[in-house]
A protein has these predicted regions:
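Soluble catalytic domains of membrane acyltransferases
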Residues: 1-108, 118-125
Length: 125
């Protein structure tokens, strides 16, 4: 994206480019960026794709845990054209238990334009 006409906008928004194939690893790059800034917002989708994912990628969780920052959860309700902020969650290190608590917050808050493409963990909720 930084080699496109969007570059000035991305720079103005203070978007940080990441090197997906760097030796340090994407998760560690993001943790390092969070730790060296006084204030930062990192946005990502745990599905890691725009298509039907069977599981969440764990990077969002490991980034929050490693940087010692909360996860702020949002849900999109396509039917009502609404975005909900579901609150924050501080990871404990027990991914499976924490994921169940996180998914419970999405209960009844999601309606997708293409429900068949919704990530499997969210289809139950």
């Amino acid at each position: 994206l930084f080699n496109t006409p969007l570059k000035p906008l991305l720079n103005w928004l203070d978007v940080i480019p990441v090197q997906r194939h760097a030796a340090q690893g994407l998760t560690q790059q993001i943790i390092a960026e969070i730790q060296k800034r006084e204030q930062i917002w990192v946005g990502m989708t745990p599905e890691g794709t725009r298509h039907n994912a069977t599981d969440f990628k764990r990077g969002f969780y490991h980034i929050a845990l490693g940087a010692q920052v909360p996860i702020v959860m949002f849900a999109m309700d396509y039917a009502h054209k609404t975005i909900y902020c579901l609150g924050t969650f501080c990871p404990t290190g027990d991914y499976e238990a924490d994921l169940e608590k996180i998914l419970a917050l999405y209960e009844g808050k999601i309606s997708a334009k293409h429900p068949q493409r919704l990530a499997k963990p969210l289809q139950k909720h």
